[in-house]
A protein has these predicted regions:
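Alpha/beta-hydrolase-fold enzymes
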Residues: 6, 14-56, 60-63, 194, ...
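Short, surface-exposed "cap/lid" segments of acyl-processing enzymes
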Residues: 69, 73-169
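Alpha/beta-hydrolase active-site loop
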Residues: 172-196
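Alpha/beta-hydrolase fold nucleophile elbow
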Residues: 189-209
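Short beta-strand immediately N-terminal to the catalytic nucleophile in serine-hydrolase-like folds
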Residues: 203-205, 234, 358
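Mobile cap/lid helix-loop segments that gate and shape the active-site cleft of serine hydrolases
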Residues: 309-345, 353
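Short beta-strand/loop motif that positions the catalytic acidic residue
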Residues: 351, 357-359, 363
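Conserved alpha/beta-hydrolase "acid-adjacent" motif
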Residues: 364-370
Length: 371
């Protein structure tokens, strides 16, 4: 009760602070919540009844097993705590996740293009291209047959192609956002035409892959290229005026620090993005596993989505800075000509492609109001 009362009091005090701009207020709210979540009684042995009961019944074996789990996670993270969220040994890409049959028909420095085998006697004439994000792996669209968007599309007669982005190392540090356009969707469109003989395609963009497709459609419109006949967007932000809690991590001071870091490394390590996303759902993605793994001494259950979530990717330095500066900080897609890709000023007002946007009310990463 005292914790709940204190939490409410801190929340009310924080909410009444005057003179803060919206971004600073978002930070105060966010980090106050992080502190309160960390201090919850359930996160401590002596104030968690379930942990006390387990400790008494097992003679403390749960705490010893929890210590083993903690040390294993520190070892996996090479000194950085990488909390296990699922039994990663239970999954293998191509074996029990990402199992829809297909093959790579084209590749370049930034991606491989997968063409999936048809499962119907007849297929639609116009191919379908999926452009997923490169902040994580493509197979979130193909986890299990029962929840695979890829399998669903193939089973409905679509000749499906999916971009699988490379996990970049330092040698790709100079790859920019426009390189992702040239070597991603534009290269894929050419490869699809070579493979099928069909010039016209439908596309689906997801997350940052959707943002890339919005910019690409504006680029194609400026070029008079009408190959893309329809576009569907999932969790895709266009107007980044209101980006919710993500704004906590994107201010001038943090961007300068990030620029210095990636200039030295050549890329942003995957765990930085993973940590940010986990902090936005800290009770579900951090503290529940701290209690389960380290206090109760249990192993996490197999869960395909969390296996994918833990399979993080790196981001090239130049692309990341352009993306965060031009698109996030400057809201560049909403400013005609502010973003220039391959010499072409991007103006999304010129897009005439029929488009459908799917945005969910509770999406904390891509708020629906920004779609």
């Amino acid at each position: 009760q005292s914790y709940l009362l204190t939490s409410r009091w801190i929340g009310s005090v924080v909410g009444e602070v005057e003179g803060l701009d919206p971004q600073d207020k978002e930070k105060v709210d966010f980090y106050s919540r992080q502190f309160l979540s960390a201090m919850a009684p359930s996160n401590f042995v002596i104030t968690n009844p379930a942990v006390l009961r387990q400790t008494a019944e097992s003679g403390g074996e749960n705490l010893l097993k929890g210590l083993e789990n903690l040390l294993e996670d520190l070892e996996r993270g090479k000194g950085r705590l990488k909390i296990s969220m699922t039994d990663e040994s239970a999954f293998e890409v191509g074996k029990n996740v990402a199992t829809t049959p297909g093959k790579v028909i084209y590749q370049n420095e930034l991606m491989q293009l997968i063409q999936y085998e048809p499962s119907t006697e007849e297929v639609h004439r116009r191919p379908l291209l999926f452009v997923p994000p490169w902040i994580n792996k493509f197979y979130v669209l193909d986890l299990q047959p029962k929840n695979s968007l890829i399998k669903w599309a193939v089973d409905r007669g679509h000749t499906l192609f999916v971009v699988s982005w490379v996990n970049p190392r330092k040698e790709l540090a100079r790859k920019d956002f426009e390189d992702y356009m040239r070597e991603g969707p534009l290269a894929a469109l050419d490869a699809i035409e070579r493979a099928t003989g069909e010039r016209e395609v439908n596309v689906l963009g997801f997350c940052i892959g959707g943002i890339l497709m919005v910019a690409t459609l504006a680029y194609l419109a400026a070029k008079g290229d009408t190959r893309v006949k329809s576009a569907t967007f999932l969790a895709t932000m266009v107007d980044l005026k209101d980006i919710g809690e993500v704004s906590v991590f994107i201010d001038e001071e943090q961007l300068r620090s990030l620029e210095e870091h990636v200039a030295e490394k050549g890329y942003l390590e995957g765990h930085h993005m993973a940590q940010m996303f986990n902090m936005m759902r800290e009770n579900d993605l951090i503290w529940s596993f701290v209690v389960n793994n380290y206090l109760l001494g249990r192993d996490p259950m197999p869960f395909d989505l969390l296996y994918w979530n833990a399979d993080s990717t790196r981001l090239p330095a130049t692309m990341l800075v352009t993306y965060l500066r031009k698109i996030y900080q400057d809201n560049g897609l909403m400013k005609p000509g502010h973003l220039v890709l391959d010499g072409v000023p991007i103006d999304i007002r010129k897009i005439e492609t029929p488009s459908y946007f799917v945005a969910t009310k509770e999406d904390h990463i891509a708020p629906w109001v920004s779609s």
